[in-house]
Amino acid sequence: MSKKKLNQPKKRIKRQILDGIAHIHASFNNTIVTITDRKGNTLGWATSGGSGFRGSRKSTPFAAQVAAEKCADRVKDYGIKNLEVMIKGPGPGRESTIRALNSSGFRITNIIDVTPIPHNGCRPSKKRRV
């Protein structure tokens, strides 16, 4: 019989990165925060749903703030000082996420809104009736 190899988790070498990009996707239901390096390689991410909020509480500014703080803690080891923020979507977590990243010790150099806006593209779905 052959011996089984034990799966040992590989230790990742944390490299020093000074500048990063924070991608914030703020939808009406959830907020996703991803911090990458300049090339686009993901360093860490967090969501308001993954931060313990469920249902309608996921879509609150406080849930987005908690997700941003959680993501900031995950990438602290890389030594990121400056962040460029790219925001996408109309959700309620837009401003609170930026405020949380700023208070986490990052210097925000640029804020870019990359919300996709159609130039009269596809026909929108029917009007919602509640």
Curated annotation (Swiss-Prot):
GO terms for biological process: translation. InterPro entries: Ribosomal_uS11, Ribosomal_uS11_bac-type, Ribosomal_uS11_CS, Ribosomal_uS11_sf. One of its GO terms (cellular component) is ribosome. SUPFAM superfamilies: Translational machinery components. Keywords: Ribonucleoprotein, Ribosomal protein, RNA-binding, rRNA-binding. GO terms for molecular function: rRNA binding; structural constituent of ribosome. It holds the Pfam family Ribosomal_S11. HAMAP family: Ribosomal_uS11 (MF_01310). Located on the platform of the 30S subunit, it bridges several disparate RNA helices of the 16S rRNA. Forms part of the Shine-Dalgarno cleft in the 70S ribosome. Belongs to the universal ribosomal protein uS11 family. Part of the 30S ribosomal subunit. Interacts with proteins S7 and S18. Binds to IF-3. This is Small ribosomal subunit protein uS11. The gene is rpsK.
